[in-house]
Amino acid sequence: MKRGHGVGEHRIARLMRVEGIRAKTVKKWRATTDLDHPWPVATNTLNRQFQIEQPNRVWAGDMTYVWTTEGWLYLAVVLDLYSRTVIGWAMGHRLTVDLAERAFTMALTHRKPMAGLLHHSDRGSQYAARRYQRLLGEHGITSSMSRTGNCWDNACVESFFGTLKRELVYHRRYTTRNEATQDIFEYIEVFDNRRRRHSTLGYYSPAEFEARTAVA
């Protein structure tokens, strides 16, 4: 059997950069929707009507995951579908109702919506839980949920997660959850909300779109 030469990791990385070779990132998968719960689920009131005419009419929430050497980091977000702005987010090492609530509470703090808002999500345990639904009810918010196993019913948030991973996460190898948290925070608040141009918004960023339509 032929044996190769011993080569250090840093030298391999340098040679790969010179040759324009990139290592393929292994994409770990983990389920985030727990359908095995006792709580009732809402009907799909949104019904894929993603083009919203005013802010704070429809919010959409969902969760995803990012792998680090320490283990999984979970991300919950709330988007205003009018401008695709991430108005609430939370990260943690457990996939819990509390994570969803923290993202939603941030959204409430930023926006202070009037009663009548529609909140769309999947029908997992975090969003169907009594305490989360009670929180929606306390603010006069109606719940809408995707059909079973149909990610297209929440396509706007799924699209955000896909873009986040393609543009950021799949190019990183996070050692700690704190490292990933800081990176994702900067992506959301510095880049995506303020600078990233969206084709659905006429190639304005969410912040530009909201500022432009507020003046119009």
Where are these regions (language model features)?
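Charged DNA-binding/catalytic regions of mobile-element recombinases
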Residues: M1-A216
